[in-house]
A protein has these predicted regions:
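Short catalytic/signature loops enriched in Gly
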Residues: 142-146, 239-308, 319-323
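Conserved signature/switch motifs of ABC ATPase nucleotide-binding domains
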Residues: 89, 153, 171, 455, ...
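Conserved ABC transporter NBD signature motif
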Residues: 63-75, 371-379
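ABC ATPase NBD coupling module
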Residues: 75-93, 119, 241-246, 323-326, ...
Length: 528
């Protein structure tokens, strides 16, 4: 159905020079088959899919003249823009990673689905609305008769992704490209979306290109897999062969970096344990034997000192009902737990289960409706803001999204020094600067990072900056709110190892919030 031959894509850099990001890859997608394209951020997965859809920015990118993308024997790269627009959306459709960026917030979901049907299939407005309702039912949207008139912002993340799928299959495409469609979703919703995609693929006899950075998902949905790194294909073949008997060192490294439910090594293996860069190429190193890694014992003896004692914690939100009434929604319903000093409590649950709300309540970023949180014997929820300010530095939070939690107008140095200035840590700015530089070194970032801005760093590096910012205040409790869920597998391993090292060194206590069971089991002493 689709044949990619020697695809080479280049992008313009700041010096107006073209840098090759996809370096001569070739692969094919047979009819009625799912092919998974796996790789970390920057491997060229999304660029490959955008090139197939004709969505690369013409002013800053170029595709080599000898590259071909053949769809049913026709080279898509030779098609005029008008003909390409007819093909994309009808014969080839795409589901993007972030549904809220892809859906128009000021149009109802029904009108957005109907627009595609009117444009590509020439339906009347009435016909298109009726078909949009059928599609919402087909993708499993609850109460579709009401949701058809809802705006994207009124739907959950999983529901938004279902709407994106409905839009993609509206014209019964022959090829569906799914670009990281489950990355931001919790495990249960992720499974539902994967099952939905597979059932729709079989029902409509489509082929699918499934793009992901998570090798664990590949076995559930794909027939064949292609592993990419730095714009090149490292390995491709049948899923069973690649996952069970990987030939390439990078594929082996990716499989070993991920935490496993059955093992708890002292440190997670990292890509650098298996391969080292030498010029433009990589050499196999194998500095560790995965099977003989020292295991870490987890759990509590019952003799530990309790640093945080939460009792009957409650939080309610209220929404308007009618003209004068209000409706109560209980986000946290009488939760109690204890956190031992120097240990990790894992909080697991789906989206909307109240995990993040508990973290925000303990930070007093939201006010609790009821309950107590005893820190060193003092109820921090009952304190005035002035009293709590003394305790605030002892409890810190690492947020899920490192792109949103760092001030883009501040340099990393300013980001690290600001909390020290607020809390009076350090005699003067030169002492604070030295403390900040020491922390950057501790989280494995170069000293030059002090003078740079957040946008100049990758997601994993930004999360290290967020961790360093928390450490400036010498906290005793760190709340990690989905702090590794948006990261690539190898970067996730680096951050988990860093958190483990910091806990061993400073005796930190963690509340680790996640929807990933293997990660929680790896790092936690107790789970709730």
């Amino acid at each position: 159905l689709l044949q990619v031959e020697n695809l080479r894509v280049s992008f313009k850099n700041e010096e107006k020079q073209y840098i090759e990001t996809v370096k001569g890859i070739s692969f094919s997608i047979p009819v009625n088959t799912t092919v998974a394209l796996v790789g970390e951020s920057g491997s060229g997965k999304s660029v490959t899919s955008l090139a197939t859809m004709g969505l690369l920015p013409p002013e800053s990118s170029q595709i080599a003249l000898d590259s071909k993308i053949l769809f049913e024997g026709k080279n898509l790269l030779d098609l005029p823009r008008r003909e390409m627009r007819k093909k994309c959306g009808k014969d080839i459709a795409m589901i993007f990673q972030e549904p809220m960026s892809s859906l128009n917030p000021v149009f109802t979901v029904g009108s957005q689905i109907a627009e595609i049907l009117q444009l590509h299939l020439g339906m009347s407005r009435k016909q298109a609305r009726a078909r949009a309702l059928e599609l919402l039912i087909e993708v499993g949207i609850p109460s579709p008769e009401t949701k058809i008139d809802a705006y994207p912002g009124q739907l959950s993340g999983g529901q938004q992704q279902r709407v994106m799928i409905a839009m993609a299959i509206a014209c019964k495409p022959k090829l569906l490209i799914a670009d990281e469609p489950t990355t931001a979703l919790d495990v249960t919703i992720q499974k539902q979306i994967l099952d939905l995609l597979e059932s729709l693929r079989k029902k409509h006899q489509m082929s699918m290109l499934f793009i992901t950075h998570d090798l664990a998902l590949v076995g559930e949905i794909a027939d064949q897999v292609i592993v990419m790194r730095h714009g090149q294909i490292r390995e491709q073949g049948r899923v069973k062969d690649v996952l069970e008997r990987p030939q390439d060192v990078y594929t082996k490294a990716l499989l070993h970096c991920r935490p496993q439910l059955s093992k708890r090594p002292m440190r997670l293996p990292m890509i650098s344990d298996f391969m080292q860069q030498k010029g433009d190429d990589y050499i196999e190193t194998h500095t560790i034997d995965v099977e003989s890694l020292q295991q870490r014992s987890r759990g509590l003896t019952g003799q530990e000192e309790i640093i945080l004692d939460v009792r009957d914690l409650k939080k309610s939100f209220y929404s308007r009902k009618g003209l004068f009434g209000k409706q109560e929604f209980q986000a946290v319903k009488g939760v109690s737990f204890q956190l031992a000093k120097g240990k990790t409590l894992g909080l697991v649950g789906e989206s909307g289960s109240g995990k993040t709300t508990i973290g925000l309540l303990l930070m007093r970023l939201q006010e609790a409706t009821g309950g107590k949180a005893l820190f060193e014997g003092q109820d921090i929820l009952a304190m005035s803001e002035k009293e709590f300010a003394r305790y605030q530095r002892k409890i810190q939070i690492i947020f899920q999204n490192p792109y949103a939690s760092l001030n883009p107008r501040f340099t990393v140095g300013q980001i690290l020094m600001e909390p020290m200035q607020v809390h009076g840590i350090g005699m003067n700015d030169s002492e604070r600067k030295q403390m900040a530089l020491d922390l950057l070194e501790r989280v494995s970032l170069p000293a030059q990072a002090f003078y740079r801005y957040p946008h100049e760093f990758s997601g994993g590096q930004r999360q290290r900056i967020a961790i360093a910012r928390c450490l400036t205040l010498k906290p005793e409790v760190l709340i990690c709110d989905e702090s590794v869920s948006a990261l690539d597998v190898s970067v996730q391993a680096q951050v988990l190892n860093l958190l483990q090292d910091l806990q061993d060194e400073f005796g930190l206590s963690y509340i680790f919030i996640s929807h990933d069971l293997s990660v929680v089991k790896y790092i936690s002493d107790q789970i709730m």
